[in-house]
Amino acid sequence: LASDPRFMLEGGAKNVARRDGMGTTVLSCVEKMGRIPDVYFQAVGSGTGAIAAWENACRLEADGRFGPNRMRVYVAQNSPFTLMYDAWKADSRELPALEPCEGRRRAEVILASVLANRKPPYGIAGGLYDVLKASKGDFFLASNSDIVYWMMQFRNSEGYDLLPAACVAVSALAQAVREGKVGKDEYIMLNCTGGGTVEAMSKGYVVKSPDLVLSPD
C-alpha cells in the first residue's frame, strides 16, 4: 500500500492540518481554564504535538481574550532513546549521530516505543528546538522504572491507567516540581496522550464479523 503512487504521505510535522488537529488539546484546556496555561507538559517522539501546542498558544494570545502567552513548553523522552534531549542539553540545533543498529536497539528497550523517532523535526525552522527556545522550555528524561512507578501512582490517585508515553509526561511534571521549575500557583497543562487500555481489556473482547468482504479476485 505504501508503495502505491496513488497514496501520498500525509506530511508529518509539515502538514499544517495535522498540527492544527493535535493542537486542539490546548484549545480544550483553555476553554476550561479560561486562560493560556503557564506550563505545558508532553512526552515527545517527533515533537509535533508540542510544536502544535505552542502554535495554538500563540494564536490564542493574538486573539486577545485569553491573556499573554507565557506558556513554557516542557517535553520529555524515555531513556535511553534520548536524541532530542541530548541535542537540547548541548544547546545544539543538530541531533547527535546515531547508528541505525544502535537506534533500533534503544527503541527496543524503552517501554514508550512510540517515542522512538530517529528523524524528528527538531532542528528545522519552527521545529521543537525553536519552540523550546521561544517558550523558555526544557527537556526531561524518564526511565522505564519511572514509567512503571508513575503508571501505578496515576492509577491509584486518579483511577485511570495511562499508556507508557503519557507516564513519561507525568514523570517530567514530577521532576519539574522537585526542581522548582513550576510554581504552586501556576496553571499547568499535562497532556496525557493515551490510556484506558487496562480498563478496556478487563471488559473482554468482542470480535465483530465483517460487514463487507472484498474478494481479492
Model regions and ranges:
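Catalytic phosphate/nucleotide-handling subdomain of diverse soluble enzymes
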Residues: 170-217
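Active-site/ligand-binding-proximal alpha/beta "capping" segment
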Residues: 1-64, 148, 152
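Short beta-strand segments
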Residues: 10-13, 42-45, 74-77, 189-193
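Short glycine/threonine-rich catalytic loop with a Thr-x-Gly-x-Asp
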Residues: 44-47, 158-166
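Short, well-ordered secondary-structure micro-motifs
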Residues: 21, 52-53, 84-88, 200-202
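Buried hydrophobic positions in well-ordered alpha/beta secondary-structure cores of metabolic enzymes
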Residues: 29, 40-41, 73, 132, ...
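Nucleotide donor/acceptor-binding cores
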Residues: 38, 71, 185-187
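Active-site/ligand-binding loops adjacent to catalytic centers
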Residues: 1-10, 17, 59-161, 205-217
